[in-house]
């Protein structure tokens, strides 16, 4: 174990924690929780189920936020006690435990520090992530599947539940497209920096001549709507198509037309769902995602940020945000933040927190510069 100046490190932890406390405004947080708790305890709360759901959901999010902060404060105090005992008794095991806990707290504070930067209108929401294969043929489809696994592994590492909502398999290998939900507070604010075009450079395993291939995939992230969001879509604006669910290689995995495709005629936004067991369930899931996309579309139109609209991301040379190079060298590099990592296997296994953190800070700096 390397020599660690625990006194200096603990002072740094406390300084970072106090900075987060000031930004969070603990007094306002506790007042918000008290007010929401009072409203949640009203006997007529569930007379309006949609409003009740919003209140209880926000209360849960705010309580989790307070718990994260208070737990970290306790862990810093406990670390200080552990270090004192270890040093007084010359206990190498205790000091090793203290070093591991120091690293763990530093990481937790860093993650919490990034969360304080998430102040967008929908940043607290759960997220729906869609991945589409772009230019590059079968390599692009394979890349889309690699990205899907990367994000699902990232969510798994954080203990975030996920639900795969739709998968459209390519003929030879990989995915044409996929959609999944990440069920965690701030999932949208966190993952929205991943939206854009991703590029893969490697020796193609599908090329008999072993040539280097460049392929692309587009990632879209939208906030999941809540029941109280005002998004009404007239029936005459939606075209409904039903078809049989398909698996790898285009084979049918269902004997009934349970898969559903919804097209919003005025905007051209298309949503497909096939992973639920019934057509009714797929239609309900597709409608919720369609409403979510239109909600974000409306906000982005109001903000005149049309570049990020659903369907506007072209999975080709333009608008690249990250490159994954596996040959002639190994490097994953974010083209916006310049953050790069040489361990490509770890990245594809879901270790992307540093990319996300850098992306959130980059976005915050850009927003502040525009003010």
Curated annotation (Swiss-Prot):
Protein location: Cytoplasm
Residues bearing PTM N5-methylglutamine: 251
Keyword Ribonucleoprotein set for record: no
Database matches in PROSITE patterns: RF_PROK_I
Cellular component, GO, one term: cytoplasm
Family classification: Belongs to the prokaryotic/mitochondrial release factor family.
NCBIfam families, per the entry: prfB
Protein name per Swiss-Prot or TrEMBL: Peptide chain release factor 2
């Amino acid at each position: 174990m390397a020599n660690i100046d625990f006194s200096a490190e603990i002072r740094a932890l406390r300084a970072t924690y106090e900075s987060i406390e000031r930004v969070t405004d603990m007094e306002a947080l506790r007042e918000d929780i008290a007010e929401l708790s009072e409203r949640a305890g009203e006997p007529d709360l569930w007379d309006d189920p949609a409003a009740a759901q919003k209140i209880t959901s926000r209360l849960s999010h705010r309580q989790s936020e307070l718990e994260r902060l208070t737990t970290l404060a306790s862990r810093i105090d406990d670390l200080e006690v552990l270090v004192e005992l270890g040093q007084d008794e010359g206990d190498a095991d205790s000091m090793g435990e203290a070093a591991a806990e120091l690293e763990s707290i530093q990481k937790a504070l860093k993650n919490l520090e990034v969360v304080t930067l998430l102040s967008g209108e929908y940043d607290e929401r759960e997220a729906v992530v869609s991945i589409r294969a772009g230019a590059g043929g079968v390599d692009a489809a394979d890349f889309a599947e690699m990205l899907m696994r990367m994000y699902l592994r990232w969510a798994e590492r954080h203990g975030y539940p996920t639900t795969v909502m739709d998968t459209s398999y390519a003929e030879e290998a990989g995915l044409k497209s996929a959609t999944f939900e990440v069920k965690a507070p701030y999932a949208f604010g966190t993952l929205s920096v991943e939206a854009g075009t991703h590029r893969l450079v490697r020796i193609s395993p599908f090329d008999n001549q072993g040539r280097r291939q460049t392929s692309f995939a587009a990632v879209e992230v939208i906030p999941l709507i809540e029941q109280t969001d005002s998004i009404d879509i007239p029936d005459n604006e939606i075209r409904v198509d039903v078809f049989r669910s398909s698996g790898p290689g285009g084979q049918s995995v269902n004997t009934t037309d349970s898969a559903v495709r919804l097209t919003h005629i005025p905007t051209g936004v298309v949503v497909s769902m096939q992973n639920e067991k019934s057509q009714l369930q797929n239609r309900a899931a597709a409608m919720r995602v369609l409403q979510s996309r239109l909600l974000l579309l409306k906000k982005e139109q109001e903000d005149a940020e049309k570049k990020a609209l659903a369907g506007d991301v072209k999975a080709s040379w333009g608008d690249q945000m990250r490159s994954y190079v596996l040959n002639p060298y190994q490097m994953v590099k974010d083209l916006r933040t310049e953050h790069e990592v040489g361990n490509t296997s770890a990245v594809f296994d879901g270790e992307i927190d540093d990319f996300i953190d850098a992306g959130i800070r980059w976005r915050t700096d850009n927003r502040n510069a525009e003010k």
